[in-house]
Amino acid sequence: MTELINTYRGAVMQWHCDQMGHMNVMWYVGKFDEATWNLFAMMGASADYLRKEGKAMAAVDQRIQYRRELLAGDTLVIASGVLEIKPKVITFVHEMRHATTGEIAATCRLVGVHMGHTTRKSEPFPQRILDAGKSLVRSYDFGERV
């Protein structure tokens, strides 16, 4: 298995925490989203590309597994990889770890569709983005990990 690629590094702030004292689920989603845009940029599907070419990406499936609480002051890192890329659809994974202990805090599997911004209809990725995405394909075991 080829290693996942680091796509985000950050910290849990006090205002990210809920009444139970740990990072609220909305912040997991937000941090995974930031990792997504870094992964897309590595493929050439950056926000600049989307704006200039009149394209968009739509998330059509997102599955998060929460494994360990993160608390205010904890640092975290997200590593990502493409699981599969087809002409119009990409499936990818994010793995969020506590940066100090290395423990997995959460995993996220997403499916995205490349589309026209105004037509809102799926369209093929340009070949260069498809090729770049293929170079980032990784295998990933969503089972119990240490």
Question: Predicted segment positions?
Answer:
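Terminal targeting signals and extreme-terminal segments of soluble enzymes
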Residues: M1-V77, L83-V146
